[in-house]
Structures are given as C-alpha cells and as structure tokens.
C-alpha cells in the first residue's frame, strides 16, 4: 500500500447522541474468498456488495496476475472469469498483498495446488507475520518454499505442487486462514483432504466451496471443534455471490452507539454467521441494548438488521472458547470494557499477538494512554471499567486499521478527545468509516 509513507492523524471528541441508519461495507472474509474461488472456477462469477477496501483490491490484483479476468462492473459489483482448479498462470512479478494476512495466506493455498512458482510479499506489518503455519501443511501436500525471509516470513517464493497429495491436517491454532489454505490446495489433490480444528473457526470457505459446486462434509470434533473433509479435483463453476455487511466493521458503530449516551442507530444487512457473532453475545451479556430483526438467510450466509441504543455496560468474563468467533473484535470490546462498571476479563488471546500488530500490547497501550487501568496476564487481558474514560491520549496505530477505529470510537465518548497518529490503514477494511461515523453524529476532526 502506498499510504505507508503519508500519515493522517485524526481526533475524536465527545459527541452528542448518535442516530441514523447505516450499512457498513461488505464482509472482508467473504470478499477475499469470492475473488479467489471465482479465479479457481470455470466460467463467470458475479459478485455484488464486494468490499472495495485495499486488502480485497490487492487480492483482486493478485488473481489477475495469476491469469483470472477480474473486472469492476459497477459500485461494489465485480465479475471474475476463472482459470479452473490448478489452472493458475505463472505470475510475472511478485504478488503484493499489502497489509492483508487473509489475501496472502489463502492465495498461498491456491498457488500450492498449481504447477507454478510465485513470490508473495506485503507491507512491513505483513512481512512481520508468521507464514510457517501456512507453508508447513502446504509442504506436506508437495509445495516447496524456494526462498523466504528469516523465520519463513515474507517475501517468500512458493513452488506449487505438480501432483498435490491430499492430507489430514490438525490446525495447531484455531485459524480460518490455515484451514482455508489447506482446503484451497486440496482442491487440486486427488482424494479427500481433511482439516481438523479443535475450535471451530469461521466457515466461509467451506460454505462458498459448496456454493461453487465442491463436495465437502463437516462433522463435529470434540466439544468445540470440527472436522472438514473436501473431495479433491471438483469442477468449480462460477457462481453469484452476494456479500453481506461485515460484522467486524459493524462492531465499531455498534460499540460507539452503546457508549454515547442517548444514541439510537440501526445497522442493516449485517452478516450473522454464528462463527462471527461472539462480540454481539458479549455486548449483550454486558447489558448492551442490541435488538435483531429482519433476519434473512437467502444468499448463503445469514444476515440481520440491528438496532443499538446507548446503554450502561457492566464488566464480564469472556471465555477463551469464544475467541475464534470474535478474534478481530477484542480491541473494540476492550474499549467498551473501559466504559463499563467493573472488571472485564478476556481470556485466551494469544492469537492477537500475530495480527497486523501485537494487538494484545497495542490494546493495553491504547487504553493506558487514555487513563484506563489494564493488565496483561499470560494470554488474558484484564480491563478495569470505571463507567467513564478520561481520554486525552495519543494512540499509536502500528499499521493496524482496527487500533485506529477502536481508539476513535473511544474518543466519541471519553471525557477528553482521543487522537490517533495515523488513520490511513482504515482504508484496508472500512474505507468510509470516517464519513459514516460523522453521518451518525460522531465528532471526528
Ligand atoms: O479467514 C479469514 O478471513 C480471517 C481469519 C482470521 O485470521 P486467523 O485465521 O489468522 O485467525 C481473522 O483474524 C482475519 O481477519 C480474517
Ligand atoms: C486480522 C485481520 O486481517 P488479516 O489477517 O487479513 O490481515 C483483521 O482484519 O483484523
């Protein structure tokens, strides 16, 4: 992304009651998958509601470089003409995934099942993130790392397998990115590729693979896990994909409306896949007034409308098994916890350390510089809620969109303004965050 050399700070101030109706942009996870499966399918895939954030745009560019035809046909409307399973062309230049772990890791899986060699790269944040977790299973399937930076990090050159082997793989951590990479590579292997996860992670890849014509069976595994078996070498056929609004983006106006007294907002068409709704469960346990209506399930993923009203929140304990269903939402939950009465304990957050930034440390710093008492104990985050937040701090974004948005939400309700050093990365996942929050009444300047 070119914006890493220009920073744009912003300040959020205590705002009057938020009101209005908004639809946040399309879901990021589904948008990446629609482009990648469209590129692996035969025929045309028509996507509506695609997230036009930089992360997804970078995935679209990579699919083009691998031989797919990717075109924008209208606002949030895109078509992809795919090359078929294992049909990727050799890219001429390194594939640049910018800030996006999802785009990069899912594309690695897809490339691992094609007889080509591709170099994967990204910005300084993505270059610092672990890739061994992805290439380990892909090497078991026959792909080979030709070159990588220290510790298996980007830039990394991967040679796809000529004859990929189907494997059974137990993911070492709950991660939809690892699971998806193995399944996408498994598309070109003969026989059944199986992924076993001890805790279920988001299942958009599984649902969309079936929508594109693959045969896949999901069974329960233990108390919270799943076993997913994909039959290899299907003919994927281009399909129509309707992308619902992203619950991870909806989280920001949702928490803002709970925190700013007297607020009353509506968020429409928010995806409600149960593997993504941990934040809503938690905010309701804290006493948040969140009403769901107009639930629909006609486009492959469920969605609903939410009315959110200003609420007095109380501290809660969030169990570790809930983490996969709200992994990207802990930053903004920590903000809600800071405004609650009482202590909130969020358990089992080790995966937060390997996101766009070390989100465990960054969240603690964000709260501390704004006068909130917070502690990290092992993998747990403990926030002492005092019913209000002093604010007045400058928050370091660390190339992480969710830190920037969380800090700005905090500033809308804190006693004194909260400033972030750089808002540029918000464009990776929620390009119209600032104008949308302003339309709802948020004071951002
Ligand atoms: O598969 C996906 O679309 C994603 C999976 C999660 O990452 P992990 O698989 O690393 O947990 C999440 O944090 C990311 O924003 C999107
Ligand atoms: C972790 C995230 O994304 P990614 O892994 O795709 O960079 C996120 O959007 O919060």
UniProtKB/Swiss-Prot annotation:
One of its GO terms (molecular function) is 3-phosphoshikimate 1-carboxyvinyltransferase activity. It comes from Rhodopseudomonas palustris (strain BisB5). It catalyses: 3-phosphoshikimate + phosphoenolpyruvate = 5-O-(1-carboxyvinyl)-3-phosphoshikimate + phosphate. This is 3-phosphoshikimate 1-carboxyvinyltransferase. Its EC number is 2.5.1.19. Keywords: Amino-acid biosynthesis, Aromatic amino acid biosynthesis, Cytoplasm, Transferase. It is an enzyme of class 2 (transferase). HAMAP family: EPSP_synth. Pfam families: EPSP_synthase. One of its GO terms (cellular component) is cytoplasm. Monomer. Catalyzes the transfer of the enolpyruvyl moiety of phosphoenolpyruvate (PEP) to the 5-hydroxyl of shikimate-3-phosphate (S3P) to produce enolpyruvyl shikimate-3-phosphate and inorganic phosphate. It is found in: Cytoplasm.
């Amino acid at each position: 992304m070119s914006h890493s050399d220009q920073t744009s700070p912003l300040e959020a101030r205590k705002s009057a009651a938020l009101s209005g109706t908004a639809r946040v942009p399309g879901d990021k996870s589904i948008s990446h998958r629609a482009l990648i499966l469209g590129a692996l399918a035969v025929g045309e895939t028509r996507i509506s509601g695609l997230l036009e954030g930089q992360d997804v745009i970078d995935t679209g560019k990579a699919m083009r470089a691998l031989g797919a035809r990717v075109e924008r046909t209208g606002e949030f409307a895109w078509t992809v003409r795919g090359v078929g399973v294992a049909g990727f062309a050799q890219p001429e230049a390194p594939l640049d995934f910018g800030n996006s772990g999802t785009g990069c890791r899912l594309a690695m899986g897809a490339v691992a099942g094609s007889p080509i060699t591709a170099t994967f790269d990204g910005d300084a944040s993505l270059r610092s993130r672990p890739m061994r977790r992805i290439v380990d299973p892909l090497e078991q399937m026959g792909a080979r790392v030709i070159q990588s930076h220290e510790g298996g990090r980007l830039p990394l050159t991967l040679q796809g397998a000529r004859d990929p082997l189907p494997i059974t793989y137990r993911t070492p951590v709950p991660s939809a990115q690892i699971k998806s990479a193995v399944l996408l590579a498994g598309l070109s292997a003969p026989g059944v590729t199986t992924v076993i996860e001890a805790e279920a992670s988001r299942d958009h890849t599984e649902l969309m693979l079936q929508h594109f014509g693959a045969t896949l069976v999901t069974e329960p595994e233990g108390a919270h896990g799943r076993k997913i078996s994909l039959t290899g070498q299907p003919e994927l056929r281009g399909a129509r994909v309707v992308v619902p609004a992203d619950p991870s983006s909806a989280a920001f106006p949702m928490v803002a409306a709970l925190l700013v007294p007297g607020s009353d907002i509506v968020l429409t068409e928010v995806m409600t896949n149960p593997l993504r709704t941990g934040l809503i469960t938690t905010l309701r346990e804290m006493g948040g007034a969140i009403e769901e209506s107009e639930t629909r399930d006609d486009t492959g993923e469920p969605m609903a409308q939410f009315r959110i009203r200003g609420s007095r929140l109380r501290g809660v304990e969030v169990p570790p098994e809930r983490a996969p269903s709200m992994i990207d939402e802990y930053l903004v939950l920590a903000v809600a916890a800071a405004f609650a009465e009482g202590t909130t304990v969020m358990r089992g957050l080790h995966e937060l350390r390997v996101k766009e930034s070390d989100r465990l440390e960054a969240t603690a710093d964000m709260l501390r510089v704004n006068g909130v008492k917070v502690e990290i104990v092992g993998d747990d985050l403990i926030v002492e809620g005092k019913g209000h937040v002093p604010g007045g701090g400058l928050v370091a974004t660390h190339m992480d969109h969710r830190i920037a948005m969380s800090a700005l939400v905090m500033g809308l309700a804190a006693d004194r303004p909260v400033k972030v050093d750089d808002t540029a990365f918000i464009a990776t996942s929620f390009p119209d965050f600032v104008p949308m929050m302003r339309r709802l009444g948020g004071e951002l300047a």
